[in-house]
Amino acid sequence: MESLQLFTRQTKAISTARRSLLVIESIPGIRYNEIVEVVLGTGESRIGQVIEVGKVTTVVQVFGGVSEVDLLSSKVKYKGETLKLPVSPDLLGRIFDGSGHPIDGGPPIVADDYHDINGIPANPASRMPPAEFIETGISAIDGLNVLVRGQKLPIFSGSGLPHNKIAAQILRQASLKGKTEEFAIVFAAIGVSYDDAGYFISNLEETGALSRAVGFINTASSPVIERLSTPRLALTAAEYLAWEQDMHVLVILTDITNYCDALRELAAMRGEIPSRRGYPGYMYTDLASLYERAGRISGREGSITIIPILTMPDDDITHPIADLTGYITEGQIVLSRALERKRIYPPIDVFLSLSRMMKEGIGEGNTREDHNNVFMQSYATYAEGNYLREISTVIGSEALSDRDRIYLDASDRFEQEFISQDEFYRRSVEETLETAWNIFSMLPVEDLKLIQEEYIKKYLPETSK
């Protein structure tokens, strides 16, 4: 009876077809986000999604556009359900498009179940705080802005900066210490070019990272509505792997700016009143519906950690996308154009970057006992060196003391040896800490005021004692 009813819930009362939207007559029982099938006069069919429900009219976003939709001969069939992702352990090692269809040449997924891409809200009382160190192999993150299991830590980038290279490097290198077999990566590329899509796919395949990863690739030429479904498909796959397969999942979403631009475009199509810089007023809520799917849940072995990557228009960190993301997430990694000009990779600005959950993932039992002291002394040393560099441009380097020159050299070494590393080199957290100690060995021992004496005796190279 239910399948028969699905075929009777249809209409030919299409009043408007504009860009990728259809405005049709409302019928009883229509739900927001419901999937529809648009059947053209030629017999060809396209999938759409209900994005607005009114008493008189309903607005449908059509995947693939409405250029061939004839108002008289086309009809809309309602499916009675929302967009769902087929899930099974076979998701690992596969690559899909922004609608959930395989694009890697493999067969369709034989589903154990179908999960709504909008997710199921977790009981707030069952949520556990982020904890436990995730090693990315990048010193500027592992040493100074630690990523913790269950955290949401965005990367703020700019046009032309190497955020794609950093995303690919994290894809290859990230792991949970001692639990490699339980660790998985879910990657979503939103509105990327064909070149970028090819880069991510080849990177996953050539490095072997694909065996523990699931990829969702949405290209810039795909329908706008797919920009909105792509991260939700990725997070649905992550929830399945985390909550049903007991895996620790790291989700990388790039580029959130393309996602928000799609929100703005759809809002403009629907004639909504814009908010800041033309973005819809509900963008904060919409972004929160993505980011808040990260976390740890009591009684579940798995976890979801999210790294959203966004490009800030005009490098403006006060832009609404970066601003709202900063309110929801627990810190940020900021890329620096100044460091990029110095050919330092990854160009992470450690002064603007912050991980609010860092102290939950460092120290004995997670990284090493001296990590917090090394973290504080690294910032102090680099900050003083940067200050002296600015002063020397005014008063001249000749006016600097011998001690000042030591700090200038230490600051340069910090950029060249600690922050900078090859994109294919995975630096362990132990190596990261040792690199910092080697830089500290340049300084007078009495200047290491932020490090406990027992750690100085234990870790400082003998030549400087």
How should these model regions be labeled?
Residues 41, 53, 63, 98, ...:
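Generic beta-structure capping elements
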